[in-house]
């Protein structure tokens, strides 16, 4: 979950596919850039993304790696890129002959988490991971601390002590309430962007998607992002 640069525009929804019929592996990413209503909303979302795909206890590891043996390192991503703003998603590199199966499973994991079908133990472990990660950032990542400082005090430094409210909000997350709140915490799947690199085109996914862009070879990803954004802005 390294720091990344803020994208120049809001990510559209839909599917972007760079087809490669000769590839043996396919990279799948499903996610978005999300603005949060509050810092506690951000901390709750971070906890649920940790539950979905962070480490050996996550749903992605259990289902995609252990049960399906389809990917060595399926994972979730949650990178803060501004005040109450984060780049988040799920990713996996899988065999090209079964990418569409795992693609559907990744949506199942997102949807089940969003519907609150989550274990209490798993949520507690994920919340602990969020807290430990914040503490680690404070100790070992001065660039992370500087960015959070500038978000809170863009014009001048405080006269008193610095209070990083995100840490307080993360401690205030009520794990026992997450399952009931999950449907309002995570984005509706129709609002996510899917990026698929490699493998053959799946006609069903192309047909079912209201927003589909086949990325031409040698074109940057921005080509499809702008195309989808333009179409959706006209709706």
Language-model segments: which ranges?
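His/Glu-based metal-binding/catalytic segments typifying zinc-dependent metallopeptidases
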Residues: 2-59, 222-235
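Glycine-rich, charged/polar anion/phosphate-binding loops
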Residues: 11-17, 73-78, 178-180
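A short, acidic, amphipathic alpha-helical segment used as a generic capping/interface helix at domain edges
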Residues: 173-185
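Non-catalytic, conformational "gating/processing" segments within enzyme and secreted inhibitor domains
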Residues: 1, 183-194
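A generic structural motif
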Residues: 2-9, 74-77, 120-127, 217-227
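A common structural junction motif
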Residues: 1, 108-117, 210-220
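Non-catalytic accessory/interaction domains
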Residues: 76, 195-234
């Amino acid at each position: 979950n390294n720091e990344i640069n803020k994208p120049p525009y809001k990510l559209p929804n839909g599917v972007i596919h760079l087809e490669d019929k000769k590839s043996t592996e396919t990279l799948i990413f499903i996610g978005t850039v999300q603005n949060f209503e509050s810092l506690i909303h951000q901390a709750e979302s971070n906890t649920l993304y940790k539950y979905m795909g962070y480490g050996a206890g996550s749903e992605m590891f259990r289902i995609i790696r252990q049960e399906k043996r389809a990917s060595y390192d399926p994972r979730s991503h949650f990178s803060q890129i501004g005040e109450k703003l984060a780049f988040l998603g799920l990713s996996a590199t899988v065999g090209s002959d079964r990418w569409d199966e795992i693609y559907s499973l990744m949506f199942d994991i997102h949807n089940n988490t969003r519907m609150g079908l989550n274990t209490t133990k798993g949520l507690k472990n994920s919340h602990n991971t969020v807290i430990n990660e914040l503490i680690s950032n404070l100790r070992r990542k001065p660039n992370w601390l500087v960015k959070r400082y500038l978000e809170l005090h863009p014009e001048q430094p405080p006269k008193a002590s610095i209070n990083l409210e995100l840490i307080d909000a993360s401690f205030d997350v009520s794990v026992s309430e997450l399952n009931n709140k999950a449907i309002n915490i995570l984005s509706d799947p129709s609002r996510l962007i899917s990026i698929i690199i490699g493998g053959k085109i799946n006609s069903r996914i192309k047909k079912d998607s209201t927003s589909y862009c086949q990325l031409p070879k040698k074109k940057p990803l921005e080509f499809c992002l702008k195309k989808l954004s333009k179409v959706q802005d006209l709706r």
